């Protein structure tokens, strides 16, 4: 807002700000220190230690904290400016056409500049079908469904070598599941870099 005097319309298929974090599993956390994220005008997090993480590393926000931050940015900074409108639950159809996902109602808006950020959006299990076939009778769920289980299973198979797969294994172990009851299918061996080398100091931007 400080870099332009333009009026801005934010169009988002999701009902709230925060991108894919709106759909993230409840025990997700940022990869890196919180202070490395957010918008320029509103600081996010601080330089305090991670309270339940590796000693010596900075705090990493939870999914709930991330959603709360973007909600705060929208309602306490963007909307009060009078220059920003947020249209959640809306599809952009092209040529200025908007359609509300729930009602199907359409409208047309006029604009000078279109900024398309959808090419940056990644695919997450919570909103995408599995990229593999699932055998009849097998139960395949996104990671967030684990917290809704009503009874134990004989075993759990985690597919994927990334952070989501690692979070799944760690959560299951912390929930008391035996390591022998967890199968971890990795299409490749992940390269893991120590986070000690990516801890910003207060004097850095």
List the predicted regions and their residue ranges.
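Feature captures the FAD/FMN-dependent oxidoreductase FAD-binding
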Residues: 50-124
């Amino acid at each position: 807002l400080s870099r332009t005097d333009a009026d801005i319309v934010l169009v988002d298929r999701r009902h709230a700000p925060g991108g894919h974090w709106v759909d993230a599993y409840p025990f997700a956390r940022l990869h890196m220190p919180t202070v490395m994220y957010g918008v320029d005008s509103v600081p996010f997090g601080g330089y305090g230690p991670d309270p339940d993480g590796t000693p010596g590393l900075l705090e990493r926000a939870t999914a709930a904290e991330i959603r709360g931050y973007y909600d705060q940015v929208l309602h306490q900074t963007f909307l009060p400016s009078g220059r920003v409108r947020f249209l959640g639950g809306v599809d952009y159809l092209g040529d200025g056409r908007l359609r509300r996902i729930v009602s199907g109602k359409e409208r047309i808006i006029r604009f000078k500049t279109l900024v398309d950020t959808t090419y940056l959006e990644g695919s997450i299990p919570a909103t995408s079908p599995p990229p593999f076939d699932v055998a009849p009778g097998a139960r395949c769920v996104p990671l967030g469904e684990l917290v809704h289980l009503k009874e134990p299973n004989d075993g759990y198979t985690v597919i994927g070598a990334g952070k989501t797969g690692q979070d799944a294994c760690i959560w299951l172990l912390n929930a008391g599941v035996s390591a022998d009851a967890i199968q971890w299918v990795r299409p490749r061996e992940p390269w893991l870099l120590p986070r000690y080398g990516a801890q910003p100091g207060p004097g850095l931007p």
